[in-house]
Design a protein with these regions (language model features):
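Juxta-kinase regulatory segment immediately upstream of eukaryotic protein kinase catalytic domains
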Residues: 1-48
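An alpha-helical support segment within catalytic cores of ATP-dependent transferases
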Residues: 27-36, 143-203, 214-215, 257
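A conserved alpha-helical element in kinase catalytic cores
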Residues: 30-33, 55-57, 66-111, 115-138, ...
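Active-site acidic catalytic loop and adjacent metal/ATP-binding pocket
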Residues: 48-64, 100, 187-233
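Conserved, surface-exposed functional patches that form binding/active-site neighborhoods
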Residues: 130-150, 231
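Active-site Asp-x-Gly
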Residues: 213-258, 265
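ATP/Mg2+ or Mg2+-diphosphate-binding catalytic cores
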Residues: 251, 279-301
């Protein structure tokens, strides 16, 4: 039986889930320790540490059969689990995405292979060539066919709508200017999603915090919020990472396009303009007025 102090949700984690899913998630939070105990027994793992974001709770575990480090991920939304499980299965041919060991989407549960050393790229220097290798792997190793009947994956337009919907809901004291800016940016993003010349499996949340350093320095993607649509979408965070001028954005998109076959520099640039206000929204709500925040807010025109 896992230590209840480990599996009981602390107040900040519970607050994030409430903000994302609403009061209906309370019952799930209360039942989490019992659910984790059942999953740990079923999958033969021992939870050692806990963490998580706004949609799930994750537990670093030791697999009893071989002492291997694995991760148990549990979400109150079965759709989120089903989407991630399908995407990870779709990328099973590549070592550049965390491996799926077991899944129970109906219970919102996934068991994921560990990544060693597993250091997040966020806050570290990164090489464009390494990021390009990751983007190439995601584009080339995913499914060749569009999702069929019964697939959990939804079009990229749905992901875009969800992201902007959450941002608009959180705009709050930013007032009408923020809402107008976000609605204009959402229209641009939806137009891009609809006009993609080709479609593939999209990670959907490929920022530096969701990329780890794996064996031999290989970059490994984790925590997809996947969709089916324009694969250029996944390059946007890397095109904008550390960038605060139009010239630097042009240079970065051209550099990535030169390293990733099929990546369209003009479309990545357009995605950056459409998503800049979305990426800047948290900093703007916090009252930041630095050069990068102003640059991102200004991308939408």
């Amino acid at each position: 039986m896992p230590d209840p102090r480990l599996t009981t949700l602390p107040a900040p984690a519970r607050a994030r889930l409430l903000a994302r899913f609403g009061p209906a998630v309370d019952a799930w939070c209360e039942a989490l320790p019992e659910q984790v105990a059942e999953l740990a027994e079923r999958w033969g793992v021992e939870p050692l540490a806990a963490g998580g974001g706004g949609t799930s709770r994750v537990f670093r575990c030791r697999r009893r059969v071989d002492e291997r480090a694995v991760w148990l991920k549990v979400t109150p939304d079965p759709q989120v689990a089903a989407e991630e499980a399908e995407a990870l299965a779709g990328w099973e041919r590549t070592a550049s995405v965390a491996g799926l060991l077991a899944a129970d989407p109906g219970a919102g549960a996934l068991l994921l292979d560990g990544v060693e050393p597993g250091t997040p790229v966020r806050g570290q220097e990164w090489e464009p060539a390494q990021v390009a290798a990751l983007l190439r792997e995601l584009r080339e190793s995913g499914p060749d066919q569009a999702p069929g009947e019964g697939s959990a994956l939804r079009p990229l337009a749905h992901r875009v709508g969800l992201l902007f919907g959450l941002a608009l809901r959180r705009a709050g004291p930013d007032g009408p200017d923020a809402e107008i800016r976000l609605r204009r940016a959402r229209a641009q993003a939806l137009e891009l999603a609809a006009s993609a010349p080709g479609a593939g499996l999209v990670h959907g949340d490929l920022h530096a915090a969701n990329v780890l350093r794996g064996p031999g320095g290989r970059l490994v993607a984790i925590d997809p919020r996947p969709a089916w649509g324009d694969p250029d979408f996944d390059a946007v965070d890397w095109a904008l990472e550390g960038v605060s001028t139009p010239e630097a954005l042009r240079e970065r998109t051209a550099l990535l396009a030169g390293l990733v076959p099929g990546l369209d520099a003009d479309r990545v640039h357009a995605w950056a303009h459409a998503l800049g206000a979305l990426l800047a929204a948290p900093a703007a709500r916090a009252g930041h007025d630095d050069a990068r925040t102003r640059f991102l807010l200004g991308l939408g025109g």
